[in-house]
Each structure stands twice: as structure tokens, then as C-alpha cells.
Amino acid sequence: MALGLNVQEPEETCADQNCPFHGELSVRGQTLNGEVASTDMEKTVVVEREYDVKVPKYDRFMKRRSRVPAHAPDCLDLAVGDTVTIAECRPLSKTKSHVVVGVVADEQDGDA
């Protein structure tokens, strides 16, 4: 099933109704990239994003972060530290309105 996003469908299958690939969940709206900060909740991950905000008084930038809870389908194997892509969907709970649609492969060279 095509999501309309530039992500690969996972090879594993799942019986999750809230999976955008194998279930009935449709995605719309914004897509975000971030790092998985927590996998403690069942079928949920917390994705953390860092961004810069300009402080006009000092003419400098300050780091901020936002944490977005997202649904983790069973077909995606997620761990803390993974860089993932999440997409907006209908509200799944009081705080969850995003779903993980893919894991971004980290391109690391041996130039350390």
C-alpha cells in the first residue's frame, strides 16, 4: 500500500489495526524526523527533535527540543537512538497523533 511518502514498506507483516502499511490507519499532514528517546510505553515511542531559536537580545541561537509521542507498529523494530520518520494521523489517544512510518538509515563513514 502506498502512503504517498518516500519511505520503504517494512518486510515484516503485522496484524496491528493502527499500522499505516498493514492496517486501516491513513496518514496526512506533516512528516517529521527525529531520534527515538524512549520505548518504555507499549506500542508507543517518544521521538525527540532538536531545533534552534534565535534570542534577539543577545543575537544568538538557543537549543530547544520537542518530544512527540508516536505510535510504533509491530512490523517496525525500533530501539532508543534510532533516527525515524513520523507522520501525522488521526488522534490515536489523548497525546498520540503521529505514527512511525520508517527508520532512516544513518550514513556513517569511517572518517573519524
Curated annotation (Swiss-Prot):
Q: Which InterPro entries match?
A: NA-bd_OB-fold (IPR012340), Ribosomal_uS17 (IPR000266), Ribosomal_uS17_arc/euk (IPR028333), Ribosomal_uS17_archaeal (IPR019978), Ribosomal_uS17_CS (IPR019979)
The Swiss-Prot or TrEMBL record annotates one GO molecular function as:
structural constituent of ribosome
Q: Where are the transmembrane segments?
A: none
Which UniProt keyword terms apply here? Ribonucleoprotein, Ribosomal protein, RNA-binding, rRNA-binding
GO CC list: cytosolic small ribosomal subunit
Q: Which GO terms describe its biological process?
A: translation
Please indicate which superkingdom the organism of origin belongs to: Archaea
Q: Which family does it belong to?
A: Belongs to the universal ribosomal protein uS17 family.
- Give the multimer and partner information: Part of the 30S ribosomal subunit.
Give the protein's function.
One of the primary rRNA binding proteins, it binds specifically to the 5'-end of 16S ribosomal RNA.
Q: What is this protein called?
A: Small ribosomal subunit protein uS17
Write down the species. Answer: Haloarcula marismortui (strain ATCC 43049 / DSM 3752 / JCM 8966 / VKM B-1809) (Halobacterium marismortui)
Q: Which gene encodes it?
A: rps17
